[in-house]
């Protein structure tokens, strides 16, 4: 039903993702202490790793497409481009567990507005075994919600 973003839509989504994530060519620990590089890549990353800007770009595309596939497989109703992009950003940030979220449940119930708003629930990180609200995650979720609620006459299933 829904299809992967391509062309200008993909380029815009990647630019938005880099704006949310930033891009670091040297591995660092994220707020939860996970070794991370480039624009949020964590798979196989260890402290001391380095990447070129081109390698970061390629990692970001690969990661975005992996999480977009998770969204497309889990959401059974048509998504417009903004909804699809926001849900992919969300999954990129929280990982495959995104499919268990209230947001995904609401979308699959045909309640897109409530699904977008439910992204706000995912605003905490675990620090020393405690869930703590993160200002950075609050800001990120607000950006994702804004993207998600932005009207679009194009549905991702009709882009190509």
From Swiss-Prot:
It comes from Pseudomonas phage phiKMV. Pfam families: Phage_lysozyme (PF00959). InterPro entries: Bacteriophage_GH24, Endolysin_T4_type, Glyco_hydro_24, Lysozyme-like_dom_sf, Lysozyme_dom_sf, SAR_endolysin-like. One of its GO terms (molecular function) is lysozyme activity. Belongs to the glycosyl hydrolase 24 family. It is found in: Host cell inner membrane. One of its GO terms (biological process) is peptidoglycan catabolic process. The gene is 45. PANTHER family: LYSOZYME RRRD-RELATED, PTHR38107. This is SAR-endolysin. It comes from the Viruses. Keywords: Antimicrobial, Bacteriolytic enzyme, Cytolysis, Glycosidase, Host cell inner membrane, Host cell lysis by virus, Host cell membrane, Host membrane, Hydrolase, Membrane, Signal-anchor, Transmembrane, Transmembrane helix, Viral release from host cell. One of its GO terms (cellular component) is membrane. Residues 20-160 are periplasmic. Its EC number is 3.2.1.17.
């Amino acid at each position: 039903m829904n299809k992967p973003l391509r062309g200008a839509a993909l380029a815009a989504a990647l630019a938005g993702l880099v704006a949310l994530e930033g891009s670091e060519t040297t591995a660092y620990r994220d707020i939860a202490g996970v070794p991370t590089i480039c624009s949020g890549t964590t798979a196989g990353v260890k402290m001391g790793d380095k990447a070129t800007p081109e390698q970061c770009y390629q990692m970001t595309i690969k990661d975005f497409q992996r999480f977009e596939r998770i969204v497309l497989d889990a959401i059974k109703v048509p998504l417009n481009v903004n909804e699809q992009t926001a849900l992919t950003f969300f999954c990129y940030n929280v990982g495959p567990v995104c499919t268990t979220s209230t947001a995904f449940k609401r979308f699959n119930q045909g309640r897109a507005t409530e699904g977008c708003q439910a992204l706000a629930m995912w605003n905490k990180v675990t620090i020393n075994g405690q869930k703590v609200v993160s200002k950075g995650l609050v800001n990120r979720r607000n950006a994702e919600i804004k993207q998600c609620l932005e009207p679009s006459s194009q549905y991702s299933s009709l882009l190509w």
